[in-house]
Amino acid sequence: FTFLSEMIKKFKEVFPKARVSMYEAQLSSFLPAIRDGRLDFAIGTLSDEMLLQDLHVEPLFESEFVLVASKSRTCTGSTTLASLTHEQWVMPQTDMGYYKELLTTLQDNHISIENIVQTDSVVTIYNLVLNADYLTVIPRDMIAPFGSDQFIVLPVEDELPVARYAAVWSKNYRIKKSASVLVELAKQYSSLDSERRR
């Protein structure tokens, strides 16, 4: 998120005593906890294969996926995924959604699963790209973590999907007032962020 810090700061002004817990993983791994009421809501990327009929889905924003490398790598024009079979990759761990599609796309381009490290940690992804010369595919909005300019987008001829982000919560449980405000702030700040990118 490029707007997370502003959103949480505003939320804590409105609800200074609210307890906030944040977890990092793919949306698909949070769905059971949302369905049984252990989580108030989650924000993540949607995919057509997710069964969400029993959930409220509030679309937030879209972000195109891009091929990302360390700035230390030289970039000489566009490339293809098939020309990157010898590279080491790091990708988010998931069994559904865009990253599963991306994993299939990489394998269709003869990138071996043995060359792909999978993790739920975005910090680990950034670390491997920055310090071990790995490649990754992430939403464009995530290429400058913590204000860093250490990552570059490698132009790729292959078509990569667009990530559709949404807030998701159960229809079977009444969403808490504080959680509802946080979802509204996510809508507000993601809209402002989208306008800034235009």
Annotated model-derived regions:
Residues 1-15, 19-23, 28-32, 174:
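N-terminal winged-helix
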Residues 1-3, 75-76, 87-109, 175-183, ...:
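Secondary-structure junction motif
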Residues 6-10, 27-65, 69, 152-154:
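Short beta-strand-centered segments that line the small-molecule binding cleft or hinge
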Residues 14-15, 100, 140-148, 158-198:
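C-terminal effector-binding regulatory domain of bacterial HTH transcription factors
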Residues 26-39, 45, 95-152:
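Hydrophobic hinge/microswitch elements
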Residues 31-32, 58, 82, 126-127, ...:
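Alpha-helical segments flanking ligand/cofactor-binding loops in enzyme cores
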Residues 51-58, 63, 123-172:
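Beta-alpha-beta core module
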Residues 55-89:
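Flexible hinge/capping segments at coil-to-helix
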